[in-house]
Curated annotation (Swiss-Prot):
InterPro entries per UniProt: MraZ, MraZ_C, MraZ_dom, MraZ_N, MraZ_sf, SpoVT-AbrB_dom, SpoVT-AbrB_sf
Name of the coding gene: mraZ
Annotated protein name in UniProt: Transcriptional regulator MraZ
Organism: Pseudomonas fluorescens (strain ATCC BAA-477 / NRRL B-23932 / Pf-5)
Keyword NADP attached: no
GO BP terms, alphabetized: negative regulation of DNA-templated transcription initiation
Membrane-spanning ranges: none
Gene3D superfamilies: Transcriptional regulator MraZ domain (3.40.1550.20)
Subcellular location, record wording: Cytoplasm, Nucleoid
Length: 151
């Protein structure tokens, strides 16, 4: 499982180093094979170990194809998905088109989301993180099922 927010840097070629604490799990789960695609809701990228992405593809394939919203989601997620591999230094290259989508430049945040990572521009992450915190602190903003969650 992947958790935590990690400040990382992209080099001039668009490569980033996967934090070392995640590398062993990624290599053991999927031989360092990753899938990177857009997040269809937030202006960031989703980074999946290959085995986790294959579960997502199975679910996407099972969606009724006559529904336009299903086809739209399939086009966005699968059409933008790129197969990548960690190199010997634990780095991977984010293609220019995906860097443009997430407005990634030099400073980024790699945020563990249990089964995947989100890759954010650092400024965008800071803004959305602050907005999320402010929103959840509003009276009545927390759903009942989350109120029962013991933290």
């Amino acid at each position: 499982m992947f958790r935590g927010a990690n400040a990382i840097s992209l080099d001039a070629k668009g490569r980033l180093a996967m934090p070392s604490r995640y590398r062993d799990e990624l290599v053991s789960r999927s031989s360092g094979q990753l899938i990177v695609t857009i997040d269809a809701v937030d202006p960031c990228l989703c980074v999946y170990p290959l085995d986790e992405w294959e579960l997502i593809e199975t679910k996407l394939r099972a969606l009724p194809s006559l529904r336009e919203e299903n086809r739209r989601l399939q086009r966005l997620l699968i059409g933008n998905a790129v197969d990548l591999e960690l190199d010997g230094s634990g780095r991977f290259l984010v293609p220019p088109r995906l860097r443009e989508y997430a407005k990634l430049d030099k400073r980024a945040m790699l945020v563990g989301q249990l089964n995947k990572f989100q890759l954010w521009d650092e400024d965008a992450w800071n803004a959305v993180s602050a907005a999320d915190l402010a929103a959840i602190q509003q009276p009545g903003a927390m759903p009942d099922e989350l109120r029962d969650l013991i933290l």
